[in-house]
A protein has these predicted regions:
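Membrane-integrated ABC transporters
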Residues: 1-61, 76-96, 111-115, 119, ...
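An intracellular "coupling" helix at the cytosolic face of ABC transporter transmembrane type-1 domains
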Residues: 41-44, 139-140, 158-165, 169, ...
Length: 644
């Protein structure tokens, strides 16, 4: 009974392994087909030319080998022993042979050059598709995948593709042609000797198939491990100051060693099997050569099969030519498997489900006439409206954007089994400043993520000017919001370009005005090139406060109806904060503003302050009301409690 259970478990594991292998093989085939579409899609004509050139090159190589028979049997041997040999016909044959050889060289030159062009073109198309699709992915994808693992797709994986397309594929095609044409030639020269070749081929394919399956498995692991190492290094480089401050160099080295050890093991195993392929095929090829020479010699001596000296010379040359393509494929096998593993990871990103958007309400420039009727305008008027198309009768109605935001019994969790916000109901009337207070993890930033629809709620509704935000197109929704995040991100470019990122068509004067409003104008003018100062590396040349000021200016130039300030002044020193606060007060006039701040002094003038605790609203009111209440906010403000 125990033996039966063990046997059944063993059979079950075997079946599971076979199913995984079958699925892996199917994925590899599908990946190869998709790569082929990239190569033949936009480069179809070039690929056909490459195909023809490879055929010519392969045929020329075979012709040179086949010519040995005719040179020996028809030209050289008949001349032996002649007192006055005539070499004219031999010279003609050699001239023809030289032309064929030259044609093969030219064809090889053409297809190698064209494959480089095709390879770079395919990589460009793959990178374009990757980046274009990446832009459509939801924030959740980037929260779940490290920057390093994504960057690895653009660097390591695309580089393996380049090597395969420009080197491995041409050699594989060349090998395929050579094998087919050589086999036919061998069959025509001596069917008896070719039977031996078929047996050797069977053995060779059986051995290489076994080695290849093991190698492919480990090459896939190698690419995953390489992405892990790349991601870890990228994270530690970005956080090097934190590592040094907390003296975590040894801990980081220990963690890196573990990842590097995993990469070493997968790479060692992959290359162990991959590098085994060449010597194995080479030795089998040598065995075939020896057996062919022995058998061919016996047949030649006995006169069986009509084997002459010329036939033997050509056949032995074909024997070398026959195993040579297998050697070439073996040499490129590692590159092909690595590239297919990398391509599979790339296509996994491209196949990621894009951010869904079922909205149909659009944000448009508008104008209101004397009767209060709203009409759509192409030019900027300073007034915005929501455009509602009605599919039933084809009519369109407009709702003025005022900035009224309401949460109605909202429940949300980043994971369904872990709720972050529970039955949240709140409102911000047009022009109100709403502040959120609470410890880390209370749900403050989550609320702003939901307003942007970076994530969608599980229960309840969020309304914007009375419209359920799920009905508003995400691009239009986000265009109506200005955001200043706690972690400031600047792009490589001038200061002017970084501010203009908030509104790409902003004039220089609008950029300068936004900078003045954010009180960034003063420090910008003190820089050597002012607004044309070039920033790089996320603006490392600037202080944290200066970077924050630019972020605020970027939001100001967008001139949005609603502002979200996620701890916008938490990284600024007290002196700079007072300067920025004046500018922010001007910026916030007439807008609906959501503020998250640890410094409670910055939100005293808020119309409403909401205190959150573990995803629930425990207090709401203005500063004076909450101080009188003497609850959590009072304790935080007076220092009896501290925000964690």
């Amino acid at each position: 009974m125990i033996f039966t259970e063990k046997y059944m478990n063993h059979r079950s594991k075997e079946a599971e392994t076979m199913n995984k292998k079958k699925k892996l093989d199917q994925n590899t085939i599908q990946t190869a087909k998709r790569l082929l579409k990239y190569m033949t899609g936009t480069h179809k004509i070039q690929f056909i030319i490459v195909f023809i050139c490879i055929f010519i090159s392969s045929a020329a190589s075979i012709a040179v080998s086949l010519s040995l028979k005719f040179l020996l049997d028809d030209f050289i041997i008949p001349l032996i022993g002649q007192t006055d040999p005539n070499f004219a016909e031999l010279y003609k044959a050699l001239a023809v042979l030289g032309c064929i050889f030259a044609l093969g060289v030219i064809a090889t030159f053409i297809y190698t050059r064209m494959m480089v062009y095709i390879g770079q073109g395919v990589l460009k198309s793959v990178r374009d598709d990757m980046f274009e699709h990446m832009q459509t992915l939801p924030i959740r994808y980037f929260d779940q995948n490290t920057n390093g693992s994504v960057m690895s797709l653009y660097t390591n994986d695309t580089d393996t593709l380049r090597q395969m397309i420009s080197q491995a594929i041409p050699q594989a095609l060349m090998a395929l042609f050579t094998i087919v044409v050589t086999f036919i030639s061998m069959l025509l020269l001596s069917p008896l000797l070719t039977i031996l070749a078929v047996v050797i081929i069977f053995i060779m394919l059986k051995v290489t198939s076994k080695i290849g399956s093991n190698s492919g498995k480990y090459f896939i692991r190698q690419q995953v491990s390489l992405a892990d190492v790349t991601g870890f290094v990228e994270e530690r480089m970005n956080g090097q100051r934190v590592v040094k401050v907390f003296n975590h160099e040894d801990k980081s080295k220990e963690e890196f060693d573990k990842l590097n050890e995993a990469l070493f093991k997968s790479s060692a195993n992959a290359n162990k099997y991959g590098n085994m392929m060449g010597p194995v095929i080479g030795n089998i090829g040598n065995l075939q050569f020896v057996l062919t020479a022995v058998l061919g010699g016996l047949l030649s001596v006995t006169g069986v099969g009509g084997i002459t000296l010329g036939v033997m010379a050509s056949y032995l040359q074909f024997t070398k030519s026959f195993t040579q393509p297998f050697m070439q494929v073996a040499q490129q096998f590692n590159a092909i498997v690595m590239a297919l593993a990398g391509a599979e990871r790339i296509f996994r990103l491209i196949d990621e489900k894009p951010e869904e958007d079922e909205g149909y309400v659009e944000l448009v420039n508008a104008r209101k006439d004397a009767n209060g009727n709203i009409t759509e305008c192409k030019e900027r008027t300073g007034m915005w409206a929501w455009k509602h198309p009605h599919s039933a009768d084809g009519s369109v109605t407009y709702t003025e954007l005022t900035g009224d935001v309401r949460f109605e019994d909202v429940t949300f969790g980043y994971n369904p089994d872990k709720v972050i916000l529970k039955d949240i109901s709140l409102f911000a009337k047009p022009g109100q400043k709403l502040a959120f207070v609470g410890s880390t993890g209370a749900g403050k930033t989550t609320i702003t993520n939901l307003i942007n629809r970076f994530y969608d709620i599980q229960e309840g509704k969020i309304r914007y000017d009375g419209i359920n935000i799920t009905k508003i197109k995400k691009d239009d929704l986000r265009r109506s919001l200005g955001i200043v995040l706690q972690d400031t991100h600047l792009f490589t470019g001038t200061i002017k370009e970084n501010i203009r990122y908030g509104k790409l068509d902003a004039t220089d004067e609008e950029v300068y005005e936004a900078a003045r409003l954010a009180h960034a104008d003063q420090f910008i003018k003190m820089l050597p090139k002012g607004y044309d100062t070039m920033l790089s590396g996320d603006g490392e040349e600037l202080s944290q406060g200066q970077r924050q000021l630019l972020s605020i200016a970027r939001a100001a130039v967008a001139n949005p109806p609603v502002l979200i300030l996620d701890e916008a002044t938490s990284s600024i020193d007290t002196r700079t904060e007072s300067i920025v606060q004046k500018g922010m007060d001007n910026l916030m006039k007439g807008r609906t503003v959501f503020v998250i701040a640890h410094r409670l002094s910055t939100i005293r003038n808020s119309d409403a302050i909401i205190v959150l605790d573990h995803g629930k609203i425990i207090e709401r009111g203005d500063h004076e009301d909450l101080i009188k209440l003497k609850g959590t906010y009072y304790q935080l403000y007076t220092g009896k409690l501290e925000l964690s």
